[in-house]
A protein has these predicted regions:
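Short loop/helix-cap segments at secondary-structure boundaries that form the rim of catalytic
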Residues: 27-35, 47, 90-96
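Short acidic-hydrophobic, aromatic-tinged amphipathic segments that line or gate anion-handling sites
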Residues: 37-43, 148-152
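Rossmann-like NAD(P)-binding element
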Residues: 43-72
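Redox-cofactor binding/interface segments in oxidoreductases and associated redox assembly factors
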Residues: 54-55, 80, 124
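ADP-ribose/adenylate-binding Rossmann-like module
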Residues: 72-92
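Rossmann-fold dinucleotide-binding core
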Residues: 85, 89, 93-147
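An accessory alpha-helical subdomain
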Residues: 149-258
């Protein structure tokens, strides 16, 4: 469902080993899809009788599209999503009576090199259909992804940390930045990140930040900024040295500091 960036990625990934069809209301978006059937009506899906349906539409429409298409699916069909935010998904899935599997490829096409994913991660929700989980585990392993299994709740806690902190940091950078005719390397790198984040769907950004676990993460940023501003205002050299030592120690498991 959906022929956007991730929908097209899954079509390319699956179409040479499986019989694949793509549904997209806007037929023009399917112009560059290959080796698959192209549908624009739910009746075509009904005749196709899919064994697995991957919902790759914009986050805002994930559940509404499920509600529309489920009446046209075989009872044994596994329904699945790849949404970045899983709020309300567990309750929805359990209300349908359908087999389901939920995953989150954490390498959106905005930043990742889709030809080289060995440094990227994917989450498979541990709740749901066993065979569906096995299918996606095999698929993601073939891509060389690092795979983690979380419950719906654990997933949303992870997303609150791994997405909200960099997103909010980018928002702050974009809010205060001024155009630079001759930007330095660090500035240009931040600009590239800002370009990627700010080109994301507004609803996706909103839902990530409205995640119930996000507030405490953002509050931590505010606390750190307050401490750093006090050090700057006081020109506290010892305090700055201590602060730099603290943050280097905080990231030493993930970043090599020379």
């Amino acid at each position: 469902m959906g022929a956007g960036k991730m929908g097209s990625f899954f079509i390319d990934l699956l179409s040479f080993e499986h019989e694949v069809a793509v549904f997209e209301r806007d037929a023009k978006r399917m112009r560059f899809t290959y080796n698959c059937q192209r549908f624009t009506t739910y009746e075509e899906i009904e005749l196709f009788k899919p064994e697995l349906l991957i919902n790759a539409v914009t986050l805002k429409y994930t559940i509404p599209v499920f509600k529309e298409v489920i009446p046209y699916l075989p009872k044994e069909c596994i329904i699945s999503d790849i949404a970045s935010v899983k709020t309300d998904m567990k309750e929805f899935y359990e209300s349908t009576g359908m087999r389901y599997v939920s995953t989150h490829p954490m390498f959106g096409p905005t930043f990742a090199n889709l030809q080289q994913l060995s440094e990227e991660n994917a989450i498979i929700i541990s709740e749901g259909d066993y065979m569906g989980r096995i299918f996606f585990k095999d698929l993601y392993q073939k891509l060389g992804l690092n795979i983690y299994e979380y419950t719906f709740e654990e997933h949303d806690k992870t997303v609150a940390y791994s997405l909200s902190i960099p997103f909010v940091s980018t928002f702050v950078f974009a809010a205060v930045m001024k155009h630079q005719d001759a930007p330095g390397t660090t500035f240009k790198r931040h600009m590239r990140i800002a370009k990627g984040v700010l080109n994301e769907d507004d609803y996706l950004l909103q839902e990530i930040l409205f995640n119930p676990y996000t507030h405490d993460q953002v509050a931590q940023i505010r606390t750190e900024l307050k401490e750093l501003l006090e050090i700057i205002d006081n020109k506290d050299a010892a305090g700055m040295k201590g602060y730099l030592t603290k943050i280097r120690n905080n990231v030493k498991r993930d970043i090599e500091i020379k």
